[in-house]
A protein has these predicted regions:
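A short, contiguous, amphipathic alpha-helix enriched in charged residues
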Residues: 35-36, 736-749
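Short secondary-structure junctions
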Residues: 15, 590-593, 748-757, 801-806
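C-terminal structured "cap/appendage" subdomains that terminate the fold
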Residues: 747-784, 790-794
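Short beta-strand elements
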Residues: 182, 596, 752-764, 805-813
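Short beta-strand micro-motifs in enzyme catalytic cores
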Residues: 5-7, 197, 723-725, 773-775
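Accessory, non-ATPase domains that flank or precede helicase/AAA+ motor cores in DNA-metabolism machines
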Residues: 1-442, 454-470, 780, 788-792, ...
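Surface-exposed amphipathic alpha-helical segments in non-transmembrane regions
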Residues: 702-704, 710, 745-750, 784, ...
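Inter-lobe coupling/hinge segments of SF2-like helicase ATPases
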Residues: 275-284, 288-295, 301-738, 754, ...
Length: 817
């Protein structure tokens, strides 16, 4: 039978239950240009709706009349490399997402098209006959009349507006089947490529000078020619701006073939270092020893993974710089991931100073155009060093040699929306594909990573001392129960007050850390006990003093606070401390002392993290009050005091990682102190000073913490001694959610009961969010294909089964909540 060229295509409209590569015919005009990694428009589903697709592979197949042809090719060149296509397919299997979900994570938003469906009247349509064919169906007649009223070409959105609350899909499908309408797709790029025009002489220098003598009555044209005779080539806009000539003068010279205009791609870039690259500082003996071991792994012909444990201020970044230098010298590229956008300005400044224009930055805070152009620079090989947050792990780097994840224990490397990937898992896959070195760095490594290093999965390196023999901060534990007994019910202990006073006297800076925004966590009535709760979520509202608003930090609901209790008219009390309340308390204790608050609300007002950080350094503001974004990676040489308020807050929650998160948080924030010449101090305020995790964090003793924590996890059978896989169900009706969860639990117990501990249904910590109830079934199991296949099967079944149509079901590896 005749073999024809076909393409395996991932289709945007395919849901997880129906997601697979679909086979399409390749029309003759596309056989020479179509390649894997190109996007196409294809007819999809029963109604042949135009839909975007990504070509995953080319093949030959027997001719079959049921095969649909590709409508058109959208990309002249592939936008995905074969490696990134393999990554998307792997993510589909690993993270329970569609291939297109993975593609949306891999590619920047600026590369996508806005695709709209357009319904067109068939050629030579007889309108009266067509309306007669519609019979008594009001919906078919309305759809046809709407298309005809718009000149025979009508977008789907317009038809949906005409139908109001009703769905036009059935009527449109019938009209297409009767060949009264045809369906087309119209696509528009989200971000367009920017081009710059450059002007140069199109004639010899002698001819240009002769033209100058002839054109004395055209001074603007003369000015343009004279400038180009002098400098040779320049931006057309700059030539007009410098000479004062209008663009019409330039166009006249181009038309007369005296000046030539060439276009070149222009890359919109974030602010970056523009000086000459400088040499990287020398390593200390301890750093050089670590670097030597890592350099050997970097040169290995096989993929390698290593964990670098270094106390805060030990100089891990300097080791990174030397490794990247080695990778570049070998013709390889490097990616460095940081956990927070707030860390990228410092990292970019440092790395650009040594590698110049070879550095690109990728994070969600960039404008779409800048992020798209940075992606293009990386893809074109113009940037060989990438610095960014979680999504930078997908940078289209060819010949990747080194991938570094700094502060690898941070939760921000895990995506909480589809696809629910962890950057560390993606990094392992990419390094395996490129035979590259994966380096995990941290002062408080993830317990699982440390276990893998101990058992030989990762190579292990340590920097146990601070750079240049600087001491770790001296830490004081402040017992807040004793403070209450002494009559101090404020947020600042007497110990911390004394240390702040001393720092102000010395002219040194301090940081106060509290992991909560707002002024007060809870507003309650002193008489009847009534509280303010979010109408959409099962949480209380947080009071923000600056605008006197009560805010839900889950759904964004806002309302003004009342002057008195809306239930009984009693006096309102504001309980709990937030960053705004701490700032007010500091001002009350130290009148006239300037403070800087760094949380999400303050950043929204300032515009960027960088603006606040620069103010803190430049103006030497005495006290910074911040949330979790100040706990890691930032380097302030004049900060000699750190105060940790409510250190117990993350300790007593229902999560097996509570100890680890608390230890890491305290250790990281304490590590911001004493990074300059002056010694550092830290005060940890706690209601449980005898707690072993608090005491280990105060001593900065990671090894002791790890030993106690790994023993506890082995006893409980939690990671790394098992894998956690959760299936979450959400819906507007709580009973429907619980019923679906119970079905999923029973399914797992019947199919994989002996290979997994099945728990649930259990509500999530915030059971109702945005008016949707959320319950979960959790598996503690060994990682296996059978368990993952069972999870994928039940997710697909529940999302297509009519009896569960009122709920949404998804699976997740090692969820954060």
């Amino acid at each position: 039978m005749l073999q024809i060229p076909v393409a395996k295509v991932a289709v945007l409209a395919a849901t997880f239950a129906f997601d697979r590569p679909y086979t399409y015919k390749i029309p003759q005009p596309l056989t020479d240009t179509l390649r894997p990694g190109c996007r196409v428009m294809v007819p999809f589903s029963r109604g042949n709706r135009p839909c975007e697709g990504m070509v995953l592979a080319l093949d030959q197949a027997q001719d079959d009349p049921r095969l649909k042809p590709i409508t058109r090719q959208l990309d002249p060149e592939p936008i995905l490399s074969p490696e990134l296509i393999r990554l998307a397919i792997w993510m589909h299997d690993r993270f329970f997402c569609t291939i297109y979900d993975a593609l949306h994570a891999i590619l920047p938003a600026g590369v996508w098209y806005r695709v709209s469906t357009v319904y067109c009247a068939a050629p030579e349509l007889d309108a009266d006959a067509a309306l007669a064919l519609c019979g008594r169906s009001k919906q078919r007649r309305l759809a046809l009349e709407t298309v005809l009223a718009h000149g025979g070409r009508c977008p789907l959105e317009t038809l949906q507006t005409a139908f109001g609350d009703k769905d036009p899909a059935s009527a449109l499908h019938w009209l297409v089947e009767q060949k009264l309408l045809t369906v087309e797709g119209a696509e528009k790029r989200v971000v367009r490529d920017k081009q710059l025009e450059y002007a140069s002489l199109a004639v010899s220098l002698e001819e240009a000078q002769e033209e100058i003598r002839r054109r004395r009555r055209a001074p603007h044209q003369v000015a343009i020619l004279e400038l180009l005779c002098t400098i040779g080539r320049a931006s057309a806009d700059e030539v007009c701006q410098f000479t004062g000539a209008p663009k019409s003068s330039m166009k006249t010279l181009v038309r007369q073939e005296l000046v030539r205009i060439d276009t070149e791609p222009y890359f919109r870039r974030p602010t970056h270092y523009t000086g000459q690259p400088k040499p990287i500082p020398a390593l200390t003996a301890a750093q050089a020893e670590v670097f030597s071991g890592l350099q050997a792994l970097l040169r290995s012909p096989d993929a390698q993974a290593a964990l670098l444990f270094g106390v805060t201020g030990s100089g891990k970044t300097l080791v990174y710089l030397h490794l990247i230098e080695q990778a570049l010298a070998a013709g390889q590229g490097a990616i460095l991931l940081v956990p927070e956008i707030s860390l990228t300005p410092q990292m970019i400044e440092a790395f650009s100073a040594y590698f110049g224009d070879a550095v690109a930055v990728l994070h969600s805070g960039l404008p779409l155009s800048e992020r798209y152009d940075e992606w293009k620079r990386i893809r074109a090989g113009l940037a060989r060093v990438v610095v960014g947050t979680r999504s930078a792990v997908f940078a289209p780097m060819e010949n990747l040699g080194l991938l570094i994840i700094d502060e690898e224990q941070e939760d921000t490397y895990k995506s909480e929306s589809t696809p629910r990937y962890h950057a560390r898992d993606v990094a392992k896959f990419r390094c395996a594909q490129h035979r590259a070195l994966l380096l995990l760095g941290s002062a408080t490594p993830d317990v699982v990573s440390r276990y893998y290093a101990e058992t030989g999965r990762y190579h292990y390196f340590t920097l146990p001392d601070r750079f240049n023999a600087r001491k770790l901060p001296d830490v004081i534990l402040a017992d807040m129960k004793q403070e209450l007994r002494n009559g101090n019910s404020g947020s600042i202990s007497s110990v911390l007050y004394a240390e702040l006073e001393e720092n102000l006297r010395r002219g040194e800076q301090s940081i106060l850390f509290l992991n909560r925004r707002g002024a007060s966590k809870l507003v309650t009535c002193a008489e009847c006990g009534a509280t303010y709760s979010c109408p959409n979520c099962s949480v209380s509202l947080t009071y923000h003093q600056g605008n006197q608003m009560l805010v839900c930090h889950h759904c964004g609901y806002r309302q003004r606070v009342d002057d008195q209790c809306p239930v009984c008219g009693g006096e309102l009390r504001f309980l709990g401390d937030g960053t705004e309340r701490i700032e007010a308390d500091v001002h009350a204790l130290f009148p006239g002392v300037e403070t800087l608050r760094m949380d999400a609300d303050a950043i929204a007002m300032a515009g960027t993290h960088e603006a606040l950080l620069q103010r803190f350094v430049r103006e030497r503001i005495p006290i910074m009050i911040g949330t979790q974004m100040i706990t890691k990676g930032l380097n302030f040489e004049n900060v000699t005091l750190v105060g940790v308020l409510n250190a117990d807050q993350s300790l007593y929650v229902g999560d097996y990682r509570a100890n680890e998160r608390t230890f890491s948080l305290i250790t990281q924030v304490v590590g911001r102190s004493g990074r300059g010449d002056a010694p550092g101090r830290a005060v940890i305020q706690t209601f449980t000073p005898a707690n072993e995790t608090i005491r280990q964090a105060a001593r900065q003793d990671y090894d002791a913490f790890y030993r106690s924590e790994i023993a506890l996890r082995q006893l409980n059978g939690t990671p790394p001694f098992s894998e956690v896989l959760a299936v979450t169900v959400s819906g507007a009706q709580e009973n429907a959610v619980v019923r679906c969860c119970a079905y999923i639990r029973d399914y797992f117990r019947q199919t994989i009961g002996e290979r997994a501990e099945v728990l649930g249904p259990a509500p999530l910590p915030v059971v109702r969010m945005n008016n949707r109830y959320r319950y979960r079934v959790t598996l503690y199991c060994s990682q296996s294909r059978e368990v993952r296949r069972a999870a994928a099967n039940i997710v697909m079944y529940c999302n297509t089964e009519k009896s569960f149509r009122d709920v949404t079901v998804f699976a997740d590896d090692n969820p954060l909540d």
